[in-house]
Amino acid sequence: MQRDKVQRLLGLAARAGGVAYGEGAAEESVRSKRARLAVVAADASDNTKKRLGDKCAFYGVRLIELGDRYELGGCMGKDFAVAAAVTNAGLAKEILKQYESRDGE
């Protein structure tokens, strides 16, 4: 995973208005089928991870884990964020591509 690129792309998506911030907004975005990708902080509670993971599995949305709540929020211009949903399809695809790639390839 190329974390810096993923974080920059999340920031771009946020500036473009293509991100739903926070646990509740991310869940609602997944439930309403607007989300193309969901992101959860590594230090989110087990309950949050399970609830968002279950929603993503049910609605067919990919879920990734990225950094802690301060890293996740910081890359999107917030103090912190436990969860977020990317609604822009093109940026979600590129974020996922960078997340799955390995350094040096």
Regions found by a protein language model. Name each.
Residues Y70-E105:
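C-terminal structural segments of small proteins and small subunits
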Residues V40-A41, I64, A83-T87:
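Small/polar loops that bind or transfer phosphate-bearing groups
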Residues V30-G53, G60-R62:
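N-terminal positively charged helical leader segments and presequences
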Residues G17, A42, Y99-D103:
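Conserved NTP-handling cores and scaffolds of large molecular machines
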Residues K50-A81:
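Mid-chain, well-packed structural core segment of small domains
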Residues G24, D43-A44, D68-E71, A89:
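Short, ordered loop/turn segments at secondary-structure junctions
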Residues M1-V40:
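N-terminal first-folded block
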